[in-house]
Amino acid sequence: MPALLSALDGAVPIVLAPTGMVPTRAMTPHVPLTPDEIATDVAAAAAIGITSVHLHARDADGVPTWEREVYARIVGAVREAAPDVLINVSTSGRTWSELEKRADALALDGDLKPDLASLTLSSLNFIGGASVNEPETIRGLARIMLDRGIVPELEIFDLGMVNFAHVLKKEGLLPGPVVANLFFGNVAGMQATLPEVGLAVERLPDGATWSGAGLGDFQLTAQSLAVAAGGGVRVGLEDGIWFDRARTRLATNPMLVERVHRLLDVHDRVAMKPDELRARLHE
C-alpha cells in the first residue's frame, strides 16, 4: 500500500488531557481537579472512546503538585473508573525544574505504575512563563523511564525538539517505539498551519505513533490537520477551556471528546483501542 494511503488507514489514538496545570475553577467550573472528579471525566470520555489519559496532579487547594502520593490517589481512581485506558503522568518543568520532583510519580508501582510519562524535549516559553528542560534533566527523566519500563510520550513544540528525539534515539534512551504529541499554536512554537504540521510529521522517527494538539483557540484546527495527515488527536481542558473560537461556550472534557469522534467520522477513521496502543508499545 502506498505510504500516504497506509498512513490514512486504521485506528488513531485519542489522548485525553483533562486537567493540566493552568485551568482553575475561576476560569471554568468544568475542570476536574480532585481524584474523583478526574476519574469521573476519564470514565465519561472512555465510554465515548479514548486511548490514553495524560494526568496532572493538584493538591487540596487546586494548586499543581508533583507529589507521588497525590498522583497515587488520582491514578488509583482512574484505574478503577476506566481500567482499560492507558495512563500517562506528567513530568512537566513548567512549575518546578528539579529532576527529583519531576520524577517522583515515576516511582509509582504495582497497579499504580503509569504506562507512559510525558517527556518535553527542550525548554520553551508559553505566553505567561517558561518551561525549563535542561538537556541532562531530559536525559535523566528518560533514563528513569527506561529503567522503570515506562514509555516516554514525547512532547514536541518545535522542530528542534523533533531533532532531539533523534539524538535520544541514537543515545539509546528511546529504544522502543516512539510515541509523540505535536503541539501547535503556542506563541513561541509551531503554528497550526499545513506546512508546519507536514514538516514536523515528516521529521519524526520512523514508525512513530503521534497525535496533534492545539493550544487555546487552535485546538480544533490542529486536530483537524492532524487527522487529515494520518495522526491521532490530543484533546482536553488542559489545552483549551472553550468549545468555540468566539469563546461563548465553555467546554467539558466529554464534549471535546465527542467532537473529536465526529471529526474522525468525517475522515472515515476510528479511535484506537487502548489494547492496540498497549501492544504497539511493547512490539
Identify the role of each PLM range:
Residues 259-283:
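Mid-to-C-terminal alpha-helical segments outside catalytic/metal-binding sites
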Residues 26, 51-74, 126, 183-184, ...:
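Glycine-rich, proline-tolerant flexible connector loops at the mouths of alpha/beta enzymes
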Residues 16, 63-91, 140-147, 199-207, ...:
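Alpha-helix-loop-beta-strand connector modules within alpha/beta enzyme cores
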Residues 4-30, 118-125:
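N-terminal small/glycine-rich loop or linker at the start of catalytic domains
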Residues 50-60, 87-91, 155:
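Short beta-strand segments at enzyme active-site cores
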Residues 35, 40, 65-132:
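Active-site beta->alpha loop and helix N-cap motifs at the rims of alpha/beta catalytic domains
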Residues 116-238, 251:
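Catalytic alpha/beta core domains of metabolic enzymes, predominantly
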Residues 38, 45, 56, 117, ...:
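Conserved, mostly hydrophobic/aromatic
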